[in-house]
UniProtKB/Swiss-Prot annotation:
Biological classification of the source: Bacteria, Bacillati, Cyanobacteriota, Cyanophyceae, Synechococcales
Entry's Gene Ontology molecular function annotations: 4 iron, 4 sulfur cluster binding; iron ion binding; NADH dehydrogenase (ubiquinone) activity; quinone binding
Protein name: NAD(P)H-quinone oxidoreductase subunit I
Gene of this entry: ndhI
Organism listed in the record: Prochlorococcus marinus (strain NATL2A)
Listed SUPFAM superfamilies: 4Fe-4S ferredoxins (SSF54862)
Cofactor(s), names only, from the UniProt record: [4Fe-4S] cluster
Length: 218
């Protein structure tokens, strides 16, 4: 009798563990079922990156002052700044600048803390190469701007799911003239500037009214 009860207990434990594994697997399945039903046919179709996407770093040689702030704030001290001291002007003279994207973690610290804004993040993410040494970009390679997804004639740009209008899951069925969900940062800035100019105009008009009254009293 005791042996039978032990077998029943072992069978129950195995059944419970099997049910747990089954629920875990179905959880992954149900999670994918709630996602977008249509995939992107890459590389003929590409998703439009977000406005704050951290892609390949763009570098402007003329703006760089060789302060090496980017090197100090980098978690792995990645940027290589080659400069010499000009004895006549007693200033740093930049010779070369390079970043190894094989080791870069794209944290954006160098872009955030650059005092002259000579570094910026682009939307380029296609950095695959057969040789890892080719991922070491010098100042010439860093100075090239990538082709935008929306301006590339050989690619069909598609919006990300958060930028689609409410109720639409498939970006392929969205008309080109359909308004996107949310506003671009440039649109928000323009609206804020317009509101600010309206407030300034109202304040100026209110200041002019007492001046006119004073002139009439005189």
């Amino acid at each position: 009798m005791l042996g039978f009860l032990e077998k029943v207990a072992d069978y129950t434990k195995e059944a419970v563990s099997a049910a747990k594994y089954l629920v875990d697997g179905l959880g992954v399945t149900f999670d994918h079922m709630r996602r977008r039903p249509v995939t992107v046919q890459y590389p003929y179709e590409k998703l439009i990156p977000s406005e704050r996407y951290r892609g390949r770093i763009h570098y402007e040689f003329d703006k760089c002052i060789a302060c090496e702030v980017c090197v100090r704030v980098c978690p792995i001290n990645l940027p290589v700044v080659d400069w010499v001291m000009n004895k006549e002007t007693k200033k740093k003279e930049l010779r070369n600048y390079s970043i190894d994207f094989g080791a870069c973690i794209f944290c954006g610290n160098c872009v955030e803390y650059c005092p002259t804004n000579c570094l910026s993040m682009t939307e380029e993410y296609e950095l695959s190469a057969f040789d890892r040494h080719s991922l070491n970009y010098d100042n010439v390679a860093l100075g090239r701007l990538p082709t935008s997804v929306t301006s590339d004639p050989s690619v069909r740009p598609l919006r990300e799911l958060p930028y689609l209008p409410k109720g639409i899951m498939d970006p392929h069925e969205l008309p080109a003239n359909q308004l996107r969900a949310g506003k671009l940062p440039s649109q928000i800035i323009k609206e804020l500037q317009a509101d600010k100019s309206e407030e300034e105009g109202k304040n100026n008009s209110s200041d002019m009214v007492p001046n006119k009254l004073n002139s009439t009293n005189k």
